[in-house]
Design a protein with these regions (language model features):
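Terminal amphipathic alpha-helical/low-complexity segments used for targeting or macromolecular assembly
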Residues: 1-64
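Left-handed beta-helix
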Residues: 64, 69-70, 75-76, 81-90, ...
Length: 168
């Protein structure tokens, strides 16, 4: 857990010019807190401690304004900047080195239990403020989703998607 924290602190220091010190990140960055709390809640989820996982996740949402379902899989060095209102669903997967801005939703379009309902972000994806990525499909490595875009179809690696509905 400590290694994940160190990596995430270094990532935030690199990606956010407003971060002035490591202590500032540890004490005052809700995206850092949300990801670290998620690591604990996800571990509880994988141990089949579902209720404990949900309580830990709920505490994280209360403290940060960022809702990450304990079943979601979050990669290393995922940076949630200005995270208020971010929602990441149960079957979502966020690859290493992705960046999510405030108001992003990685949501589902189905209520079917036991199936993949949420998107998969491959490594190095950036999702702009207010964007909604909805459904069980993949956003390819290095893709960029513009602010307030609504994406409901797969996105090719390296593509830039904007608008409602999202298009290249």
């Amino acid at each position: 857990m400590l290694q994940y924290a160190r990596e995430l602190i270094a990532t935030i220091m690199q990606k956010d010019p407003a971060a002035h010190s490591r202590w500032e990140v540890v004490l005052a960055y809700p995206g850092f807190h949300a990801v670290m709390i998620h690591r604990l809640s996800h571990w509880c989820w994988t141990q089949d401690w579902k209720t404990v996982a949900r309580v830990v996740s709920h505490a994280g949402r209360f403290l940060t304004g960022i809702e990450i379902h304990p079943g979601a899989r979050i990669g290393r060095r995922v940076f949630i900047d200005h995270g208020m209102g971010v929602v990441i669903g149960e079957t979502a997967e966020v690859g290493d080195d992705c960046t999510l801005y405030h108001g992003v939703t990685l949501g589902g379009t189905s209520l079917a239990e036991g199936t993949k309902r949420h998107p998969t972000l491959e490594p190095n994806v950036i999702v702009g403020a207010g964007a909604k990525v909805l459904g069980a499909f993949t956003v390819g490595e290095g893709a960029r989703i513009g602010s307030n875009a609504v994406v409901i179809k797969p996105v090719a690696a390296g593509a830039t998607i904007v608008g409602v509905p999202g298009r290249q």
